[in-house]
A protein has these predicted regions:
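Core catalytic ATP-binding domain of two-component histidine kinases
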Residues: 1-173
């Protein structure tokens, strides 16, 4: 298990380096439910017992052409932000579903979002995101965390990976 975790860490670092150079990693057809289950299992082990971690996954959601390590990175970043927003207790839920959007706006690139998508949703029971933070949360190095507690790169990385794969980020707070 330790060796596998070490290999995963190495792969994540490699993907972050690849992403920083503006490359797409290695997209391939993926069934997302098994990947999400595995990632959630790893994340769940890092959460305090005062945080409930749940999933609702459509096992028959369509495949998507994605890099699995980058999907894992996005999930980890979103769940870590959710954990931190709840300040020690609450609920995080990860959902996977085929969905359609008609007139949404991407929170990170501000483009209109319409069409059919495979959607990964991370929600939490935290207090919500203040409007002034919503405006800047995807900017590189922007952070609401105290110095030394966050790099401000988590959501910027989410933005980059999601958009490199042709997706968008919707925020409801």
């Amino acid at each position: 298990r330790a060796q596998r975790s070490g290999q995963r860490a190495r792969a994540l670092i490699q993907q972050m380096l690849t992403f920083s150079r503006g490359q797409r990693g290695e997209p391939r057809p993926l069934q997302l439910a098994p990947l999400i289950k595995e990632t959630v299992k790893l994340l769940g082990a890092t959460l305090p017992s005062s945080i409930e971690f749940a999933t609702r996954l459509e096992n028959d959601a369509p495949q998507a052409q994605l890099d699995p390590v980058q999907v894992e990175q996005v999930l980890m970043n979103l769940c870590i932000n959710a954990r931190d927003a709840m300040q020690g207790n609450g609920r995080i839920e990860v959902r996977l579903a085929a969905t359609a959007h008609e007139s949404q706006i991407c929170a990170s690139c501000r483009q209109a979002v319409a069409g059919h998508f495979v959607e990964i949703c991370v929600s939490d029971s935290g207090p919500g995101i203040p409007p002034e933070v919503l405006e800047r949360m995807f900017e590189p190095f922007f952070s609401t965390k105290e110095v030394g507690k966050g790099s401000g790169m988590g959501l910027a990385t989410v933005h980059g990976i999601v958009h490199e794969h042709g997706g968008h980020v919707l925020v409801d707070s």
